[in-house]
Amino acid sequence: MKQERTSKVKGLIKVIALVVPFLLNVNAFASPAESAGVTHDSIAAVARTEGAHAGEAPHGEAAGHGEEKAGDVIMHHILDSNVYSFEPFGEIVLPKIVVGGFDISITKHVVTLWVVSAIVLIVFTIIGSKYKTMSPKTAPKGFVNAMEALVEFIRLDVAKANIGPGYEKYLPYLLTVFMFVLLCNVLGLVPYGATATGNINVTLTLATFTFVLTQIAALKAHGIKGYLAHLTGGTHPALWIIMIPIEFIGLFTKPVALTIRLFANMTAGHIVILSLIFISFILKSYIVAVAMSVPFSIFIYLLEIFVAFLQAYIFTMLSALFIGLASAHEEHADHEAGAAHH
């Protein structure tokens, strides 16, 4: 049993290493203006403008400018940009590349995607080498043991529970997505890190992978005839003119939900943290900073760590659920529908 489990983990690690490189530069979905975010020149201009007004404006207007500047700084941290700041040590201006109208520039979020992909490849390569040299009778320890527990959790509680028979062929993708989304979320909470999952282009690409895999699973399970028959909803031909558009639109609501859910949750958390921090600067009060800004920021930060894990789990679980629903046979679906009805 132990040897069989070890061989399965080895196989999963190999496939994961093959899937990860596809989760790289997704910036081509954005227009040049969107991907550039807040450029260095615009930030400098805002800073000069705010400095000029600060010496002239009355207290009320100065507070308004302070709020505006705080909003600019928050958006600078949230939006993608080709300027990677390492305050107070300086900044790195990343190259802008536009090919045939598509922006494939290297930005903060693209760098984060590369770093996350490298981490996933390195981690699973190390674990794979450990399993190659490990005796089947030897229990894994430390980090290897933790990763085996993670693999078993995704295998049993996510893939097998939501997909059912034949879940093994989708497990490498689910493991890769979970680790990828989790690391993207966590790196956004690290100093000088950027939250790639706070970029809707990234979440849209991840959701597109799930969408494509879901349609492939449906075609394999039901064939082209069964796949097209699903669009009619099993209704009378007279209702097809209504049901087919509804079912067709329904195909795209799932990836849209995945896209917005992950993007909104990760973006909102960072906005809340930065807003709480800037309250003390806007009001210019140390009392507010000590009594409210710092404690609430720490609380929200800890909550964001939990949300980082939760959103990675939810994205993976919903991906498995959509694959399971698409590949489920009619009798299995009817059985589930009957159980839900009762």
From Swiss-Prot:
Main location: membrane
Gene giving rise to this polypeptide: atpB
Its biological purpose: Key component of the proton channel; it plays a direct role in the translocation of protons across the membrane.
Disulfide-linked positions: none
InterPro entries, A to Z: ATP_synth_F0_asu, ATP_synth_F0_asu_AS, ATP_synth_F0_asu_bact/mt, F0_ATP_A_sf
UniProt keyword terms in alphabetical order: ATP synthesis, Cell inner membrane, Cell membrane, CF(0), Hydrogen ion transport, Ion transport, Membrane, Transmembrane, Transmembrane helix, Transport
Record's GO cellular component terms: plasma membrane; proton-transporting ATP synthase complex
One MF term in the entry's GO annotations: proton-transporting ATP synthase activity, rotational mechanism
Protein name in the entry: ATP synthase subunit a
Subunit field text: F-type ATPases have 2 components, CF(1) - the catalytic core - and CF(0) - the membrane proton channel. CF(1) has five subunits: alpha(3), beta(3), gamma(1), delta(1), epsilon(1). CF(0) has four main subunits: a, b, b' and c.
Bilayer-spanning residue ranges: 11-31, 109-129, 170-190, 199-219, 238-258, 262-282, 287-307, 308-328
Subcellular location(s) per record: Cell inner membrane
The keyword ATP-binding belongs to this UniProt entry's keyword annotation: no
Membrane topology qualifier: Multi-pass membrane protein
Record PANTHER family: ATP SYNTHASE SUBUNIT A
UniProt record similarity statement: Belongs to the ATPase A chain family.
Keyword hit for Membrane: yes
